[in-house]
Amino acid sequence: MKSSICCFSGYRPEKMPPDLPEGSAAFDRMLQRLRWSIRRASGAGYRHFLSGMSRGFDLWAAEAVLELQEQGHAIDLWAVVAFPGMEQYWEPEWQRRYHAVLSRAVKKFPVSAKYAPECYTLRDRFLVERSSRCICFFDGVPGGTAYTVRYARRCGLLIDNLAERQLCFDDLNIIE
């Protein structure tokens, strides 16, 4: 089963590079690479996509999975929530997006019953330990994404890093 599961890891909006604000042409290109990576993983047999459901890359990735699912791709979304209510202090638009995505996830995994200092690390480990591939946006900034990508590498996951300037997908090069 693990061979058909892919997780996501990436930054919250405020940690994304300043040249990638949501709605910009550069952001749209990143989303295009994200959708391409999901389609590529689906073509390689991945059917289940795990999102950590945080603002930013996690939710953008979850929305992309749902969009591709609507287009007929045989994939589904699993929501891995650090703790119930983690979205309650977010901006209203992010709360709306979170609930829209959560309502369409076929599986929901609350990792902790309530907030605890280690709940996000536990969530990140849950994502990695159940997956064999990780699609991420990581450009070297320290924090939770750095931890998750390092852990995924140690666990032997295939890594598709959308922050790399040149992504090679078999014989296709996507160059910015």
Predicted regions and their residues:
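Acidic/glycine-enriched connector segments
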Residues: 1-175
